[in-house]
Amino acid sequence: MKREKTKMTQKQNTLTKTGIVALLACICCILWGSAIPLIKTGYRLMQVDSADTASQIVFAGVRFTLAGILVLIFASIREKKVMIPDKEILKYAVPVCLAQTVGQYFFFYIGVAHTSGVKGGIITGLGNFIAILMSCLIFRNERMTGRKIAGCVLGFAGVVVINLMGNSLDMGFKLTGEGFILIAQLSYGISTVLINLFSRKVSPVVLSGTQFAMGGIVLTLIGVGMGGHLGNVTVGGVAIIFYLAMVSAVAYTLWSVLLAWNDVSKV
């Protein structure tokens, strides 16, 4: 018992070191960044039109369902037993699933189809800052400080500058465009804070796998209900979906583990 407690303390000390947190967070961001061009390649191989939001949601649903299964398989191998989510896990996985996988991606895919890349990029950049504000002001998980406010302002300003370089910005606003992307980022902020809270009560790995699998199934059903489908299933397309599932499985699980040991603003 004492040995297990010592190991847990060592793990906590390691995962709260600023250098380690920064390195692992950067790895997550690199993995997420690598997914963007491959998503477009996957659409092309599976004949998913850029304006076919329903089929894009089906594509995302299959990806996240597979990601959830992969995470649960990994957890089972690590624990040397089949990790079947119990009532305790499901109690926490449902709200995370609704906020992150279902809410965020459903509104994001529809919003992206109805706005420009510049405005979409700027609004998407709000996600992390919304999460920090929610953690400090609504959920009261941490204190708001001048440094955090300055970090949010400078970070968002950087996102705006990068997205405006060589581009113009019109001031139009559509609910199904910019509005839906903003809702997606609010969902992301809520899910980030929920993961931060719930990962301290249950295994962040099992929580991540369960919410992915549940959310992926819901997204797939929503997409199919909207008339979506994957028109041309090829070996290359399947390989890309598998890679994207691995990206989600590794990056989001790692992100959840970081949130379990650190404040939202630090991650």
Where are these regions (language model features)?
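Transmembrane alpha-helices of multi-pass small-molecule transport proteins
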Residues: 45, 49-101, 130-134, 187-191, ...
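Loop-to-transmembrane alpha-helix entry segments
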Residues: 121-124, 140-161, 171-177, 234-239
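Specific alpha-helical transmembrane segments that line the substrate/conduction pathway
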Residues: 58-61, 65, 69, 99-100, ...
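Glycine-/small-residue-enriched transmembrane alpha-helix faces in small-molecule transporters
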Residues: 2-61, 170-197, 217, 221, ...
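Hydrophobic transmembrane alpha-helices of multi-pass small-molecule transport proteins
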Residues: 71, 75, 133-134, 146-166, ...
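Hydrophobic/aromatic residues within transmembrane alpha-helices
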Residues: 42, 59, 111, 137-140, ...
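Specific transmembrane alpha-helical segments of multi-pass solute transporters/efflux pumps
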Residues: 76-120, 124, 161, 244-264
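Juxtamembrane C-cap of transmembrane helices in multi-pass membrane transport proteins
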Residues: 31-52, 66, 105-115, 123, ...
